[in-house]
Amino acid sequence: MANTFKYYPETMGNSSGYPISLPFPKGSATSAVNVARQLPKYLGHVPSQSVHTQLPSMASLGYFNQPSSTYYAPPAPLQQHQQPPILPPPGLMYTSNNNSNVIPPPVQMIRDGQQQPQQSNQVNGGVSENLDYDISIMSKFIMENAFVAFNANYSTDDQTTDLFFKGISSVLNATRLPSATIFLAIDYLFKYINKLSNGIHSIGGNSINIIYQNTMIAFILANKFNDDKTFTNNSWSQATGILINVINDFERQWLRIFNWELYDSAFLYFEFVKNFEIFKQNQLKPAVAVPTLLSPIVNVGDTRNVNFNLKPTSTNNLLSPVSNYETPMLMPHNMFSSPSYQSNSRSEFSSMNGYYNYYNYNQPRLNYYQQFPNIYSSPISETQFDYDFYNFSSQQQQQQQKQHSLLPAAPQLPPPHVHNQSYGHHLGWKSMDDTINHSRFERNYFPYSAVY
């Protein structure tokens, strides 16, 4: 039973017309019911806030003396209905709209100390999560070293070479070997070939499959020797695509050749690091346009079609002067100098190992490294290599001699005046006033320097 009173009792009111709430008289329940059934006296509309009479205390009534009527609390004041804000159509600026109902879009607030989760590339396995090299550049570095080790002359535009490059890149992506392990694997590859009795012929030559298989075995041994996290041969079989029994046979053969001794105190790690940095810088350099070759100056009065055999001896030595008519080095040496390769000496890089040289190899084995003249530029070689730029073939010389004997001699150009000044070079200048007696040129042909 509720302990409340009603504002408007059904039976009583004072002289002013205001309702008076009094407790029901004590009596039987029947009298209370009869009183409750009497019709209320109409007192008119009286607002609830005008009630000034203090309600009696409920403490003296007790549990059973409470009135039968129920007290109803006044209704809560109605709140003013506010229409939800209307968002502007897309494309309108919020500052130009004066509508108070328009609110700017919500801005995500970041609490202090709360940082956005950074998105990072997920690395699935591998030795190193963060590599200290670019996989594409390192793959080219490995490929070129493998070709030098096997004395293989493969073109970089060849489809087979492209597959070899993609195979190395795939293995590096799967295993994520550190650079130290890769350099050790390249060192193992050179040592293994040097230890073979018949060189590359002992293992079947230098086909692209043999180069790829032995390069992968070098990776396997370097990983097992140098890294804390190693892979099983089954994992290497899945990464390289080589059958596991082939990997096992190659590994046993390599270990027998090395006499089970993979540690070498003469491993020149810092030399590999330096060479890789040079290689990377050359890979990142923009391609430089090759200068246009100048036409050789021949007899002006002779209008015959003379065929020249232009035979540059180096891809980067396009403007080497003719022998005995040497031009002083007025240009930067990294553009027009001739590289010199000595077959009887090795650099410090191979002095300890004694079997290979990275940058100072013989001419037949360095078809690739000729594109770095600024690394090993030197004066023109006087050894077994020919650096003449304009050369006649023997057949062309015979044809020209026959034709020249039938035609009258053409007028001879006067030689240019050259001061007899000596330059600090081992060959020096030879005056053009002297009689030209070069075995490869006829008396009416004057070779001039290609550098102006």
Curated annotation (Swiss-Prot):
Assembly with partners or alone: Forms a cyclin-CDK complex with PHO85.
- Family recorded in the similarity comment: Belongs to the cyclin family. PCL1,2 subfamily.
Task: List, in alphabetical order, the GO biological process terms annotated in this UniProt record.
Answer: positive regulation of macroautophagy; regulation of cell cycle
Q: Name one GO molecular function term.
A: protein kinase binding
Q: Which GO terms describe its cellular component?
A: cyclin-dependent protein kinase holoenzyme complex; nucleus
Role played: Cyclin partner of the cyclin-dependent kinase (CDK) PHO85. Has a role in cell integrity and polarized cell growth together with the other PCL1/PCL2 cyclin family members.
- For the keyword Protein transport, the answer is no
Q: Which residues form a coiled coil?
A: none
According to UniProt, the name of this protein is PHO85 cyclin CLG1
Q: Which organism is it from?
A: Saccharomyces cerevisiae (strain ATCC 204508 / S288c)
Tell me which UniProt keywords the record has, alphabetically. Answer: Cyclin
